[in-house]
Amino acid sequence: MNETKKYLVIKAIAQGKKTKKRACVELNLSERQINRPLLAYQQKGKEAFRHGNRNRKPKHAIPDEIKERILKKYLSYETYKPNVLHFCELLAEEEGIKLSDTTVRKILYKKNILSPKSHRKTKKRVRKQAKLNLNQPLDNPILPTAKDFLEDPKKVHPSRPRKKFAGELIQMDASPHAWFGPETTNLHLAIDDASGNILGAYFDKQETLNAYYHVLEQILANHGIPLQMKTDKRTVFTYQASNSKKMEDDSYTQFGYACHQLGILLETTSIPQAKGRVERLNQTLQSRLPIELERNKIHTLEEANTFLLSYIQTFNEQFGNKTKLSVFEEAPNPSERNLILARLAERVVDSGHHIRFQNRCYIPTEQGKEVYFIRKTKALVLKAFDGDIYLNIADKIYHTKELLDHELYSKNFEQEPEQKKERRKYIPPQTHPWKLTSFKQYLHKNKKDYEEFTSEEIHSPQLQV
């Protein structure tokens, strides 16, 4: 009961301004219960209504020394500020202080220190309390009605349950952020909708097809073939196709055909809420991962990608593994995946019996010997996942040999160097999916039509990657 109200009512009784029966109704007490505070008022006055524990520190209260250590530790993070839950984990790991996130949050808020993940409403409330120097939360006297909270039907994106099986739906996205150092890099991610596990992660300078191929390779190697993938429509998968008619520039077709050969249903969406799992994962990692990278002194893309391999396992143990039911299918072997995760380009053989790709010339080879095709023979160039170049001519795949600008040695003035024995390369079978006819059928089905480029039609002096 409010001490002030009780004091004013009892005071009115003592002064003869109010009857005991009226006081019983106002304070919801019996007449006997009214007599006790009335007697105390006559003996002690207003002090009789002061609670005995006021200004007394509880036995379970956190010592001021611990609070100072917590504040000093949080303020020591200069580049990246952790959210409160992550900070509690760091406190337990580095300082041996084990407190709940609610307790730590109250300590920080009392000093007007806000978490980087605080909501706008919380920031406004804390600032208002600091300005008015109040210890109790402020109440808004104007109460809204339920109608004021109804959402516009066009903006409604209701929550949905997770999928039942792991591998039933994979959400993919790239998150640009200053993950380490001042420069912005892109973290490409794939998360399983059912289990909440990160299935693949890869850093690159930009959002690239190569990075998504690395993520897909991690999924295939560690888990298998999923049923469906959902990606952002405004990403590397679509924006290049509108600016170029070159096949190799259409990342969506390249990635889509790889998924088509694996039997993965690829879906794109422009609505962030439609792939909320990966969007929330981006926010979580933007808060946590930069601190872990800084703690481990990670400064390069190579170091960051190596660190991700162990970090994903730790992250999944803490936040994932929500289901063990799986519908992942067995993935192709590494040699087959190397060709499935490839870049494609249409070329024709020129009068020098070679094709030109990315400002370099290549001649098809078979069992180490050069194979010469007639001029204008159509070829499908395959830049494999490991960077090797293959040619598909009449549905037969050939290895290639790069045509150098100058000879490596002079037969007239130098001794011929010893020839290193080449390792036996994987030769795809005739049933391999990268067939020109099947690829053209896929293009036709997706209403794609690309012009063919001869080697003489490419004159850019810069190497395209």
UniProtKB/Swiss-Prot annotation:
Residues 157-340 form the Integrase catalytic domain. It comes from the Bacteria. Keywords: DNA recombination, DNA-binding, Transposable element, Transposition. InterPro entries: Homeodomain-like_sf (IPR009057), Integrase_cat-core (IPR001584), ISNCY_transpos (IPR047797), RNaseH-like_sf (IPR012337), RNaseH_sf (IPR036397). The keyword DNA-binding applies. The keyword Secreted does not apply. GO terms for biological process: DNA integration; DNA recombination; transposition. Pfam families: HTH_29. One of its GO terms (molecular function) is DNA binding. Gene3D superfamilies: Ribonuclease H-like superfamily/Ribonuclease H. Found only in encapsulated strains, not involved in capsule production. NCBIfam families: transpos_ISNCY_2. This is Transposase for insertion sequence IS1202. It comes from Streptococcus pneumoniae.
